[in-house]
C-alpha cells in the first residue's frame, strides 16, 4: 500500500514539473527585455517580473493580448500566447526570487 501511495504521489508531481519547464522555456523569450529570470537593473525601462504575483502577471499579459492595456510592443508579443502558456509564464516568474 505504501508503494502504491508513493507511486501516485510521484506521478501527481509530473504535471507541475512539466508546467515549470514550459514556463521556464517560454520565459526565455522575455529575457531580452525583462532580464534573466525576470530580474532587470534598477534603471531599466521595463519592470522586473521576478516575484510578482502570478495573478497580476497573467492579468496584465491577457490585457496586453486583448488590447485593453496600452503598450508599445507587448500587445504584439502577448498575442502569441494562449491562456495556458500565459499561466505557465506567470507561475514561473512568480516563483523567481526578486
Region locations from a protein language model:
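Short, flexible, mixed-charge glycine/proline-rich loop motifs
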Residues: 20-24
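Gly/Gly-Pro-rich "capping" loops immediately C-terminal to redox-active cysteine motifs
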Residues: 38-66, 75-79
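Detector for the c-type heme attachment site
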Residues: 34-39, 94-95
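N-terminal signal peptide c-region/cleavage motif recognized by signal peptidases
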Residues: 13-18
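The canonical Cys-X-X-Cys-His
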Residues: 28-36, 89
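Sec-dependent signal peptide recognition
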Residues: 1-7
